[in-house]
């Protein structure tokens, strides 16, 4: 009997191996066609030179931006050709050159001048527009003259975004001796307390963990804070950080404090927050409605029932060699699809809320370093993360609200680069897609599909998916068993303690 089982397992493994080989062969064929087409000049090059040329082309077209608020900036087309025009300290100008910041983006052109003058700022801009540097540059420029500890505090909704903001400050402040620290949940509080006692200039934090340290870390306070930044403020409020923000705002000083509020969208909650925390702010907006950048090509793929996994593998094969983020609605789907991709020899890693901080940063590092070409993620990755050169975004699950769609597809076509998004649409997603198209103000074109390849892949992909689901179920059972074992040991110890009493 065991021999029969082994033969069946061997046959299944052979079939999966055969599928992977077929996919690799098809991928090599696609790559060969692409190379030949490039030689003939018939297709766009994905080389770094072409990306740079595309970027320059986009930057040459003036961005139509608006500024309207309590303090009006009436020059709607104001722009700068270089950061030296902003009258920054030489060390900061050189850091911008080192980072290949060729010229200020529209939001930077709008926000940095009034920020340098000392105004509070409300910055509204679409994702990928350079919001982080828009508030980091004026803070660092002022810090060069003051050099005080606990000088600025930046609040971010997620641990990943906080870490990326820290990286931006460290890079821009590399020639200025800037000390920064990242204070987020999921990490050791004692280690963070020691970092705070070293009196960094810049603190980047999630609201909950910052409040923990303000209440419990001896010797730490923000009484002399000069700058407060709330980045992705709409997300902060969506994640119900409102009560914590209120407590933080009551603790930190209001006099001699400059406050910046940056967000992708303006809502009634944001308006309430800015009235509570900002004084006569300048509102700098380069986008006052949900929209996507012109360099993003958005399409959809109509998927028959039960074939979504097959269509996904079809896409991975068609776009082999491209960097891709696949968005799912659930953590379980993120794990399952990551496993499916890897089983079929597409290098993938998962990012979702069940991972601890080290696991999440590890997944991001693998993807950013190019060691994994596919990131399968829930919406935890959709906001604020600066992941360079993402070629394609795939919506495996359609988001339930249009705002989430905008933020997801905003992971590609950043900073003037071109990019593509593809949404897999089943019959149950039609209403969601109609809402998204209404917000975008256009119909999304359909992606073409080779039905013969779909039919060829179907059985093998279903079988591979079954293998992944079985493995996930096995791991879950082991996890539950370990949990019961621990609870059993704890109950035994409690019974022994009761016996002693």
Swiss-Prot record:
Catalytic activity: ATP + H2O = ADP + phosphate + H(+)
Assembly notes: Interacts with the SSU processome.
One GO process term, biological-process aspect: rRNA processing
Domain Helicase C-terminal stretches: 307-461
Stretches the record annotates as Disordered: 36-79, 480-501
Compartments it resides in: Nucleus
CDD domains named among the record's database cross-references: DEADc_DDX47, SF2_C_DEAD
Role description: ATP-dependent rRNA helicase required for pre-ribosomal RNA processing. Involved in the maturation of the 35S-pre-rRNA and to its cleavage to mature 18S rRNA.
The protein's name in its UniProt record: ATP-dependent rRNA helicase RRP3
Gene Ontology MF, one: RNA binding
Residue ranges annotated as motif DEAD box: 231-234
Compositional bias annotation for Basic and acidic residues: 491-501
InterPro entries recorded: DDX47/Rrp3_DEADc, DEAD/DEAH_box_helicase_dom, DEAD_box_RNA_helicase, Helicase_ATP-bd, Helicase_C-like, P-loop_NTPase, RNA-helicase_DEAD-box_CS, RNA_helicase_DEAD_Q_motif
Residues holding ATP: 125-132
Protein's organism: Saccharomyces cerevisiae (strain YJM789) (Baker's yeast)
Hydrolase as UniProt keyword: yes
């Amino acid at each position: 009997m065991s021999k029969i089982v082994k033969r069946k397992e061997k046959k299944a493994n052979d079939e999966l191996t055969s599928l992977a080989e077929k996919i690799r062969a098809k991928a090599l064929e696609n790559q060969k066609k692409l190379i030949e087409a490039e030689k003939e000049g018939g297709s766009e090059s994905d080389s770094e030179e072409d990306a740079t040329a595309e970027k320059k082309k986009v930057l040459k077209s003036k961005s139509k931006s608006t500024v309207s608020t309590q303090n009006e900036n009436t020059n709607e087309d104001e722009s700068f050709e270089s950061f030296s025009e902003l009258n920054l300290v030489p060390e900061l100008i050189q850091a911008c050159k080192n980072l290949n910041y060729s010229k200020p983006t529209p939001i930077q052109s709008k926000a940095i001048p009034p920020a340098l003058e000392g105004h509070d700022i409300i910055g509204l801009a679409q994702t990928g527009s350079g919001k982080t540097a828009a508030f980091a540059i004026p803070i660092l420029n002022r810090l060069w003259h003051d050099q005080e500890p606990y000088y600025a505090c930046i609040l971010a909704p997620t641990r990943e975004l906080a870490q990326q903001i820290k990286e931006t400050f460290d890079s821009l402040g590399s020639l200025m001796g800037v000390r920064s620290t990242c204070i987020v949940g999921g990490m050791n509080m004692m280690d963070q307390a020691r970092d705070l006692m070293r009196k960094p200039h810049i603190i980047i934090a999630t609201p909950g963990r910052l409040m923990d340290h303000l209440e419990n870390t001896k010797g730490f306070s923000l009484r002399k804070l000069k700058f407060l930044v709330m980045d992705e403020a709409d997300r902060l409020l969506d994640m119900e950080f409102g009560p914590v923000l209120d407590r933080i705002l009551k603790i930190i000083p209001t006099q001699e404090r400059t406050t910046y509020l940056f967000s992708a969208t303006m809502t009634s909650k944001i308006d309430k927050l800015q009235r509570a925390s900002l004084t006569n702010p300048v509102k700098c907006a380069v986008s006052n409605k949900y929209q996507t950048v012109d360099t993003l090509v958005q399409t959809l793929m109509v998927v028959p029932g039960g074939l979504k996994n097959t269509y996904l593998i079809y896409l991975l094969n068609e776009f082999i060699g491209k960097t891709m983020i696949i968005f799912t609605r659930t953590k379980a789907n993120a794990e399952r699809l990551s496993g499916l991709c890897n089983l079929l020899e597409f290098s993938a890693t998962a990012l979702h809320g069940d991972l601890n901080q080290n696991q999440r940063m590890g997944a991001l590092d693998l993807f950013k370093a190019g060691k994994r070409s596919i990131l399968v993620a829930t919406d935890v990755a959709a906001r604020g993360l600066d992941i360079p050169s993402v070629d394609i975004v795939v919506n495996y699950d359609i988001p339930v609200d249009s705002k989430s769609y905008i933020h997801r597809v905003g992971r590609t076509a950043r900073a003037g680069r071109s990019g593509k998004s593809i949404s897999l649409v089943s019959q149950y997603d039609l209403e969601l897609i109609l809402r998204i198209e209404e917000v975008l103000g256009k119909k999304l074109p359909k992606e073409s599909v080779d039905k013969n390849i779909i039919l060829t892949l179907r059985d093998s992909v279903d079988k591979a998916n079954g293998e992944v689901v079985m493995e996930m179920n096995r791991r879950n059972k082991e996890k539950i068993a370990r949990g019961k074992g621990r609870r059993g040991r704890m109950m035994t110890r409690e019974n022994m303690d009761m016996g002693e009493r």
